[in-house]
Amino acid sequence: MRTRVFAALLVALCAGNTWALATFDAIKSDFQPSDTQVLDRQGELLQRVRTDATVRRGQWVALADVSPALRHALLLSEDKRFYEHSGVDWQAATAAAWGNLWNQRTRGASTITMQLAGLLDGEGRPAGGRSMVQKIGQTLDATLLERSWRKDQILEAYLNLVPFRGELVGIDALSRTLFGKAAHGLDAREAAVAAALVRAPNANVRQVTQRACGVLGQMQTQGQKLEQTRPAGQGAKPPPPPDCEALDMFATAALQRRAFDASEGVAPHAARQALREA
């Protein structure tokens, strides 16, 4: 009886999620940058013309092209046991008080897989929080997602679909706008700021800096522990704490940038004419 009830609940909750049957390749194929590339007859780029003014999305970035520092910072900030759980971190959920177990202000129990399930379902970050049915549905969605997608696919899709700040969606738009470089070139300091923005996309600079400084400190501590496991690194002095004041100045400058460096082209007028005629 309980099995039938659970199965019926599962079907009801997932019935409206058209993505539930979607493959990673389908989600990646449906991804649309906010700029359209206009090519000439020889396939050379004429211009990138912005065709979606609602958000700023760059190109889809493969996980292998994301810097190790960013992957490290994101997992430390959002989901330390990402590679250990099956969609829901029950250890974190059990440790959290029931009153704020699924509170969006507390990410301790909200895994990357659960967040991705919300993004794929079009929920994003609901301002009023999720209802109990939505919370249960998100848990089930994450479990289904883990059964059909590999971990690297989940992390790659998350990095490309997660909103970072303002109109910026996805790691390519973030890295090129705030840091003026591709995602593979982000260093530890830039990665810490990016991870802080995932937690609170529209927080003020001071809040972003405080969060980023904490993430950077965790990265340094883990790096030191890893070094101490090697014979040559035993007895090494711990690294100095991160310079939060310098990080504050860096984050302040980065968050003021608005230019997206992939918007230039060689023939803007010809490109726009070709786009109108397409």
Give each language-model segment a name:
Residues 77-90, 96-97, 198-202:
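Cell-wall polysaccharide-cleaving catalytic domain and substrate-binding groove, primarily
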Residues 37-65:
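His/Glu-rich zincin catalytic helix
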Residues 22-24, 53-63, 76-77, 139-140:
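N-terminal post-signal-peptidase region of extra-cytosolic proteins
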Residues 1-6:
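Bacterial N-terminal signal peptides that target proteins for export
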Residues 65-73, 150-152:
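Periplasmic N-terminal gating module of Gram-negative TonB-dependent outer-membrane receptors
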Residues 31-33:
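Short, small/polar residue-rich loop motifs at catalytic or cofactor-binding pockets
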Residues 18, 105, 109-278:
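Non-catalytic, structured segments within soluble enzyme domains
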